[in-house]
Amino acid sequence: MTILPKKKPPPPSDPEGNGERSGSGGADSHSRSGARPRSSPPPRWAYPGNPAPPERHPAGTPRPQQASPPPCSGGSGGAGSGPLGEGALGPCCCCTGAGGCCSGPGHSKRRRQGVSAGPGAPGSSPDREDGAGNNSEDEYETAARTQAIDPDTAEQQEHWFEKALQEKKGFIIKQMKEDGACLFRAVADQVYGDQDMHEVVRKHCMDYLMKNADYFSNYVTEDFTTYINRKRKNNCHGNHIEMQAMAEMYNRPVEVYQYGTEPINTFHGIQQNEDEPIRVSYHRNIHYNSVVNPNKATIGVGLGLPSFKPGFAEQSLMKSAIRTSEESWIEQQMLEDKKRATDWEATNEAIEEQVARESYLQWLRDQEKQARQPRKASATCSSATAAASSGLEEWSGRSPRQRSTAGSPEHPDLHAELCMKPPSPAATLMLGKPPSPCAPGPSNQTCAGADRATSPLVSLYPALECRAIMQHMSPTAFGLKDWDDDEILASVLAVSQQEYLDTIKKSTLRRDSSPDHS
């Protein structure tokens, strides 16, 4: 008879351990409810001990820096490998609650501990249980880390980071608006040149994730459709999954800088090329900014535009702006020249007018001076001048009606006396004189004087003498009904001209006959 050894009794069960194991199982089933089968999520940062990535996507550049504590190992949230394993980056988030919009690659240790305690454990809450399906531990721990940073130290660190990038790399950090879409704003600024295009970038990214859901769903802890719907909100932050999707979508590497001159992470696309990467900077574990290279145009690269040359549009616009500026300057100069020419012409006209006015005034002064100078003349000229002056005054003092009534039937005695009175010799002599002393001929037969040709009154002497004589004569003697100054002056001038011509003829005959007698 064979005696078999007795089995050892099982050790007494530990109620706490059983509770923990049962709680862990419940948490695992709860966290996986409705989720796709997936591999373990990758850690947030790359470490030397991580396995190599699969063949689809090139691995991110491993960096020794760490922006957050390393992920926890063990259980379903242990470190694993995946295409996003190397180069996984924490999200840009400002969420303070369990239901935040940010998501990262690793499980939250705090979440696992809270869930493993079970729903009836002390310290557990429905909010913590409801948020257990989110993808990133930063949704729970970012607020605590942010509050622990000293504002002065953070400001100095930001200043040093910006200065180091500009001095060593020549890059400029372009600030993005802090509204939850900073990652998409930074990418939109790099691709479209306008951060307000972040909604378009977000939509394209979410559509790309949905088309490749069989691949990207392996790196999301929650239901993938729920994750995509949450990420479509404009105030929901992005993380490393969106970076990888945008790197593949635009076929441009995505470089992430965090307080250093070398990128701490690089996300590569499916195909390698020489295109300029999309550069973003990560600040205080909560915010992304755009890093711009001012010496190289990158806007439009990755949009699939045929025959597109970065910066060509800017060069064309610059040439057009320069040409427009030159044309405007030329037109302005031409307008100024026209204004100056117009002013010059107006100035010349004003000067000429002023000179003419002054010359005319000077001529009037000279005429007045010459008229006031005493004239040297013979006795005949003096008597003729006196008679002419008295006759002119008397003639001008009488009105035309008085002059016309001199020969009217109302004064027959005066008319007869005037008709019987012979004209004076001086008047007879003056009738034979030429009307102007400037006319050719013997102008100095009766009166000689140096100032006779220049005096303005000399030319009036014949007219004055004629008027003195005509005022004593009746208009009927000349076949006129009444005296008319214009007709009388015309007739007198005609008679004077005829007498002047006769005098010239006589003087010519005398000159011709004088040589014969000699």
From Swiss-Prot:
Residues 282-287 are annotated as: His-loop. GO terms for molecular function: cysteine-type deubiquitinase activity. Residues 39-53 have a biased composition (Pro residues). Residues 171-294 form the OTU domain. InterPro entries: OTU_dom, Papain-like_cys_pep_sf, Peptidase_C85-like. Residues 231-241 are annotated as: Variable-loop. Disulfide bonds: none annotated. Residues 116-125, 377-390 have a biased composition (Low complexity). Deubiquitinating enzyme that may function as negative regulator of the innate immune system. Has peptidase activity towards 'Lys-48'- and 'Lys-63'-linked polyubiquitin chains. Can also cleave 'Lys-11'-linked ubiquitin chains (in vitro). This is OTU domain-containing protein 5. The lineage of its organism: Eukaryota, Metazoa, Chordata, Craniata, Vertebrata.
